[in-house]
Regions:
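Long, low-hydrophobicity ectodomains and other hydrophilic envelope-associated domains
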Residues: 21-223
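N-terminal secretory signal peptides that target proteins for export/translocation
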Residues: 1-2
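Sec-dependent N-terminal signal peptides
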Residues: 5-14
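Sec/Tat signal peptide C-region and signal peptidase I cleavage site
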Residues: 15-19
């Protein structure tokens, strides 16, 4: 997406313009968010926020619902949003999810951290336990729905919601699996999550093709 167009989107959303710094060919940084255009990945730091309990969110900002999230980050939601736009992510930008899977761009999410001898890497879904299936969340993509605007504000930024396990159009990324409307079904898979306050890296990968892209109309009113 054109950088000038992104700047216009930020202005219309009431968000500050962002300076992107090229750290190597095809690799850019926006704050603490690193964008690799060739690999089509976004990376940024976070910490383990909880190791047990209900998992309504996989990741929130420090001003988000930290009492319900596996991870938290100091990175701002709008920085992640701009990084996704730079990789061609569109999202659905709707404030309403129907019974079908959320519309948007499929992405994969990996969490990594330094272990005793080597770097540990797990799929984000490994960190969440599906009570109905009595096993970790099924493997597969998440959906970048892109949140939405309300009265000139970018809602993900206001709510601090980045990756949601339960259905939440305010978040940037949502879980498309069955039972996403059941707040009590998802818990933290403590076997796959390191100790609280462990530093981790969140890596979001955007496929070159998006077969599930689009399908929902854009709106700017909450329901």
């Amino acid at each position: 997406m054109n950088v000038r167009l992104i700047a216009t989107i930020l202005l219309l959303s009431g968000l500050p313009a962002l300076a992107q710094k090229e750290v190597s060919p095809g690799v850019f940084e926006i704050g603490k968010v690193r964008i690799n255009k060739q690999k089509r990945t976004i990376e940024f730091p976070a910490v383990v926020n909880m190791k047990e309990g209900l998992a309504e969110y996989l990741l929130v900002s420090t001003k988000g619902k930290v009492h319900e999230s596996v991870l938290r980050t100091e990175v701002e939601p709008f920085q992640v949003h701009v990084a996704m736009l730079l990789l061609g992510g569109k999202g659905a930008q709707t404030n309403f999810f129907g019974p079908d899977k959320p519309s948007g761009d499929p992405v994969t999410i990996e969490i990594s951290w330094k272990g005793f001898l080597s770097t540990k890497r797990v799929a984000a879904e490994d960190m969440v336990f599906d009570r109905a299936r009595n096993r970790p969340m099924s493997k597969g993509s998440w959906i970048y729905n892109g949140s939405f605007q309300f009265e000139g504000l970018f809602v993900a930024q206001e709510a601090g919601s980045i990756i949601s396990v339960i259905a939440d159009p305010e978040a940037l990324i949502n879980n498309p699996r069955e039972r996403r409307d059941d707040d009590d079904n998802w818990t933290i898979n403590s076997k796959a999550v390191p100790s609280v306050e462990t530093l981790v890296t969140v890596t979001i990968k955007v496929p070159r093709t998006s077969p599930g892209e689009g399908g929902a109309s854009s709106t700017n009113s909450r329901q």
